[in-house]
């Protein structure tokens, strides 16, 4: 596992603060080409009044969103609907995944007030469904599991009718962490596999594919009422047969919901896009996934874990009842 230490001077007691690079571990990597995106991936720039209001509430509560940190292409659409995915435990991740635009380094201490701030923002936005994710916190004994649980509890207390979806890290080598999170009773537990196992060393070197599959399986064993969800990116050099095997692995873990989206390269220092997968291939993946038994599938070039999450959750409940 790669954990990056921040050795620059970020001491708030000094008058000058050294601005550290966002991805220090990638600084010496050779540049990779960034191809122009095809027409089916381009989106409108954000800027509506509702978008501005969402931004104001996020800023007032001093919160971090994965929408901004991960450079999500859907931020204009989602924030215009007052939908935001909150990223707890800071803006700095202890992992160094080759696809991700979130800052890498040694994070600061947890903000004990953050669960309440997230709950306040959820109430102000009037969310019927909220998605909460986090950076990886390998530096914490429980990987941040108790902080997840506290955030869920705070949202429940302030907005009891709001359904809660969490997108968790893998809690690798964090005994009891998953049990803590599941005991907090989120409605949906999402953990993304991100890519097929043959690409893990290059794309997700700090993670273990079958550990992630087992985490999803264990979550359902701990509480069968929870909906489980996972997502992957395509365009990283995977074969179709590998994606189909991944679907089988997730179904063997009784995962309910699969998302598949196009990988988009954040910078020249990140993993290159090996291929822009056309929309008809996403449609084929969706049909195959439904045939394999998933309750819900979202497979489009712009699909992301929390995109249309509220609408998808309502469909999930209806399909389980059917």
From Swiss-Prot:
The subcellular localization recorded is:
Cytoplasm
> By its UniProt entry, which InterPro entries does this protein fall under?
Aldolase_TIM (IPR013785), Elp3/MiaA/NifB-like_rSAM (IPR006638), Lipoyl_synth (IPR003698), rSAM (IPR007197)
Gene3D superfamilies linked:
Aldolase class I
Q: Where is the composition biased (Basic and acidic residues)?
A: 14-34
Keywords annotated in UniProt? 4Fe-4S, Cytoplasm, Iron, Iron-sulfur, Metal-binding, S-adenosyl-L-methionine, Transferase
How cofactor binds (record note)? Binds 2 [4Fe-4S] clusters per subunit. One cluster is coordinated with 3 cysteines and an exchangeable S-adenosyl-L-methionine.
- SUPFAM superfamilies associated with the record: Radical SAM enzymes (SSF102114)
User: For binding [4Fe-4S] cluster 1, which residues are annotated in this chain's numbering?
Assistant: 67, 72, 78, 306
Name of the protein described by the UniProt record: Lipoyl synthase 2
Give the species: Bradyrhizobium diazoefficiens (strain JCM 10833 / BCRC 13528 / IAM 13628 / NBRC 14792 / USDA 110)
The gene it comes from is lipA2
